[in-house]
Swiss-Prot record:
Keywords: Membrane, Transmembrane, Transmembrane helix. GO terms for cellular component: mitochondrial inner membrane; mitochondrion; TIM23 mitochondrial import inner membrane translocase complex. It comes from Saccharomyces cerevisiae (strain ATCC 204508 / S288c) (Baker's yeast). Residues 44-56 are extracellular. Belongs to the MGR2 family. The gene is MGR2. It is a multi-pass membrane protein. The keyword Transport does not apply. This is Protein MGR2.
């Protein structure tokens, strides 16, 4: 039975996937930051008329929304520069050279230690 064909390159995530990943990472950081700063503000200044839970929730929601928004936008901006083929004209040549080196190493049993 012949071996299965191997894919040498994996498909990159789409911009929508990068947006969602940035949103989730930013929201997670925002929740942690909101708990820390909100807890500190409540401990030093008191909860105010809304109470502890509602005040802490406001801090968490505000920082989670802000961090999530900026991280998602930043991940899209960062991924736009990689999508243009003219940004790295020698990238295809570099990938071909690596593939040929990999084939030669596999053919002659040369291991990189």
């Amino acid at each position: 039975m012949p071996p299965l064909p191997q894919n040498y390159a994996q498909q990159q995530p789409s911009n929508w996937d990068k947006f969602k990943m940035g949103l989730m990472m930013g929201t997670t950081v925002g929740v942690c930051t909101g708990i820390l700063f909100g807890g500190f503000a409540i401990a030093t200044q008191g909860p105010g008329p809304d109470g502890v839970v509602r005040t802490l929730g406001k801090y968490i929601a505000g920082s989670a929304g802000t961090f999530g928004l900026f991280m998602s936008i930043g991940s899209i901006i960062r991924s736009d520069s990689e999508s243009s083929p003219m940004s790295h004209p020698n990238l295809n040549l570099q990938q071909q050279a690596r593939l040929e080196m990999w084939k030669l190493r596999a053919k002659y049993g040369i291991r990189k230690d």
